[in-house]
Amino acid sequence: MARNIKVEELLQTPIEKQQIELVERKGIGHPDSISDGLAEAVSRALCREYITKCGAVLHHNTDETQIVAGRSSPKFGGGEVLQPIYMLLVGRATKEFEGAELATESVALKAARNYLRNTMVNMDLERDVIIDCKLGTGSSDLRDVFKRDRVPMANDTSFGVGHAPFSELENIVYNTERQLLTDLKSRMPAIGEDMKIMGLRDGDDISLTICSGMIGRYVDDLDSYINMTQEMKTYTEELAARYTERNVNVFVNTADNLKASCVFLTVTGTSAEMGDDGSVGRGNRCNGLITPNRPMSMEATSGKNPINHIGKIYNLLSTQMARDIVKQVPDVQDVYIRLLSQIGKPIDQPLVASAQIIPKEGTSFANVKSEAEVVIDDWLSNVTKITEMVIRGELNTF
């Protein structure tokens, strides 16, 4: 059956030539990102458990995970959590298969602890956090969808959005958080995982504002704190120079009051220890960024089942399509993908698969159009590949 694939030329100023561009990334220790990470870790663990015990992924969604902030007393050289962070794993899961009960809550709790242990390395899981699990049972109608031996049927009438390639600013913002928390943190353990990077490009001038919770036990005093934040600034300036020749100004923890020694210190590395709650889907989109200059879906991607939940599959799929078009089709400057499903219809037959392309100057759009159609059709023909990639942990969702 022919697919409704529409590729059109977009008469719009390319992102790099627009006057103003804004890009944001919430770091992996931001309360919203922790919620995303927990939800996705639980979903992937349930997928593996279902495959092992049942031979296939059964119905589940864990995309309602919530974090309620605790209270803490951070200080130079130490500090303590006074009231633990409360983390609630919420959603639906299939708890019985062919008459046998499945230990879904135990699987979820183990996955959550493992995720926190590997991500929030300064969080004491015995003292600093309470993890609770409330997984209901999915409806029989939805569970039946997973039993059909064919391409899964869409769970909803919804859409997914993706774009490529990353702009200079998008690359800078994304990689600043990643490199600060991997490369620089390996030498400066005081850097907390709770970090926000906000990028502004005004013409050829880029401003990066970094908000980073430092971990008190690794910071001896105010002078040490100042030296560390200055090193973060210098590191980021050098990193940004790899991606752009534009002017870059970096600002770190601009809310600090150095005269009053009032600075951004934490005990665990996340502001969830003191006043900041978190929810799934309030942070980064599945490409790892928040990009108001680009089309975006407001759907949470993390925690949704990877079989037929359009909010997950089509956002991931559209992003992969866009990236492959840029890789495989010459002379594409910007590409935007939108996929729209119809509830109950096969996910490889979207109501429309739309690509809007800004070609490079002097390019024949007819050639670009036909090649882009092939990429889109090929991905839709192999749509379940996204499911396999998610279960194997090959695709990030935030």
UniProtKB/Swiss-Prot annotation:
The UniProt catalytic activity note for this protein reads:
L-methionine + ATP + H2O = S-adenosyl-L-methionine + phosphate + diphosphate
* Keyword check for Isomerase: no
Signal sequence span is none
Matching Gene3D superfamilies, A to Z?
3.30.300.10, S-adenosylmethionine synthetase, C-terminal domain
Q: Quick check: keyword Transport in the entry?
A: no
Q: Where does ATP bind?
A: G136, T137, G138, S139, S140, D141
Give the keywords, sorted.
Answer: ATP-binding, Magnesium, Nucleotide-binding, One-carbon metabolism, Transferase
InterPro entries xrefs: AdoMet_synthase_2_family (IPR027790), AdoMet_synthase_3 (IPR042544), S-AdoMet_synthetase_arc (IPR002795)
Instruction: Supply the EC number(s).
Output: 2.5.1.6
Q: Which GO terms describe its molecular function?
A: ATP binding; magnesium ion binding; methionine adenosyltransferase activity
One Pfam family name from the record? AdoMet_Synthase
- Superkingdom is Archaea
Top EC class for this record: transferase
Question: Which cofactors, if any, are listed as required?
Answer: Mg(2+)
Sorted alphabetically, the Gene Ontology BP terms of this entry are:
one-carbon metabolic process; S-adenosylmethionine biosynthetic process
Question: What pathway annotation does it carry?
Answer: Amino-acid biosynthesis; S-adenosyl-L-methionine biosynthesis; S-adenosyl-L-methionine from L-methionine: step 1/1
The record's section on HAMAP family has:
S_AdoMet_synth2
Q: Which NCBIfam families match?
A: PRK04439.1-3, PRK04439.1-5
Q: Which family does it belong to?
A: Belongs to the AdoMet synthase 2 family.
Task of the protein: Catalyzes the formation of S-adenosylmethionine from methionine and ATP.
> What is the protein name for this chain?
S-adenosylmethionine synthase
Source organism per UniProt: Methanosarcina mazei (strain ATCC BAA-159 / DSM 3647 / Goe1 / Go1 / JCM 11833 / OCM 88) (Methanosarcina frisia)
